[in-house]
């Protein structure tokens, strides 16, 4: 009897709250949210990216409690976190490795969208919000890379901020505004720390918009055809929550391996040397997730042209819904596009390799060919394939 009264009382409280703030209805919606019944494990990447973002925010907030954004103390404060803060080494490695894992997840998420045509109507805005999230992620990661104030941090900040000086007329004022002076110094570090703390919460807001856009027309699927009836769908919970947990398990196994066995594998040893404005590293290398764009930047001798191509390589993704003229979404039914897609993937990986190499021959000339194909894929190959390709017959149902 007492248990029944307690249960009714708790239900009454939940109903009272839900009537005024429908948070319980919102979570209940996920139990009944209908999704295509044929989604594969690549569709767990969105949930994994959400987990990665939460990990980055939690570890970042705790690390910020112990970090000192000052050029004389930043490097020492990071070393203090590693040595004197309880589990500071774990927090830092979780945050740094987590950034790489986050980007790896997002790159796979984007690749899945490219292959299955998730950018096509009516999901153009969903795609655009995703690319905006990617851009802010890149800005956040770059600013975070500067914070340890090692040699690679300092000189990467110097190289990237000086890129804006290539813009005619307004370039120099932009550089001074970014740096807070005529060079990378204490004001730069303070600004980057402040923005690095702010941007993840902007990403959270954009993720909410991303989910709203996703729920408007539902998920795409491997066949790329629209849901025609309820027999083509199943509830998100428990069918896809179970699948997501399998993906989480694989993700955390890989994550744990890098944290505990290879925490510095994806970093650069020069960043364990305190920043010295008088000593330039022999080879300035960004983090691995920036290297394809870095290779495009260095592919041409003109600084302005390099900056234009580097930013253009990202902004061309915004035009993708209109550059791909095919009416078929999924690459499973587009034999020529499927070949072009894998060539493009290989080209992106090759650009990443070239971005890690010194700016000398033969890497420069090879970078030009690779960068040329990168843009040709979007501006030439996709429009032509969409016009002349004969797709395979689409199935009638999922």
UniProtKB/Swiss-Prot annotation:
Superkingdom assignment: Bacteria
GO biological process, one term: respiratory electron transport chain
Residues the record lists as binding heme b b562: 95, 196
Molecular-function GO term, any one: ubiquinol-cytochrome-c reductase activity
Keywords per UniProt: Cell membrane, Electron transport, Heme, Iron, Membrane, Metal-binding, Respiratory chain, Transmembrane, Transmembrane helix, Transport
TM region positions: 45-65, 97-117, 129-149, 164-184, 192-212, 245-265, 304-324, 335-355, 364-384
Chain sites annotated for binding heme b b566: 109, 210
Bilayer topology term: Multi-pass membrane protein
Subcellular location: Cell membrane
InterPro entries documented for this protein: Cyt_b/b6_C, Cyt_b/b6_C_sf, Cyt_b/b6_N, Cytb/b6-like_sf, Cytochrome_b, Cytochrome_b_C_euk/bac, Cytochrome_b_N_euk/bac, Di-haem_cyt_TM
Cofactors named for this entry: heme b
Recorded family membership: Belongs to the cytochrome b family.
Quaternary context: The main subunits of complex b-c1 are: cytochrome b, cytochrome c1 and the Rieske protein.
Name of protein: Cytochrome b
